[in-house]
């Protein structure tokens, strides 16, 4: 079997739950020919890529798929690019709020996902699933771990991707701005089966 390292984040800001980690927890341990290895990341600048690096060294996965939360869409978003910028609109869970800082000094401005995002989205759309391409993973900790993963694993066989998942109904006053966790998890399973 192939190995998939999949990550999600703890809650941050005003939220008491994070659908990215909820979804990771709800996924089965095996999907298609992937054996899933689950890892929770904290919303803290500067520390979480180290956890990913340790897990990658230990597991030698075929694919690294990181999940984050997106309050701006009910689609599942497959991000195409990570930028070399920390630019927080809100504090992390330790109160840090970096502003206009590079993630890697003198590093490339951006990296593209090594996961074949366009092919995956096209396939999901053919199945009428609410999956879309994202052209920014923001400048918060999602982007930081995505950028550092691509920076460190760009020339390896491991595929690296980032997926933003929508809020859950219990997190919003208007349920039309959210997607039930069961639906998100089912769509993620389809995406993983297609990698």
Model-identified regions with their sequence ranges:
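N-terminal catalytic or cofactor-binding beta/alpha core of small enzyme domains
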Residues: 1-137, 151-155, 176-183, 189-195
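Glycine-rich beta-alpha junction loops
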Residues: 71, 166-169
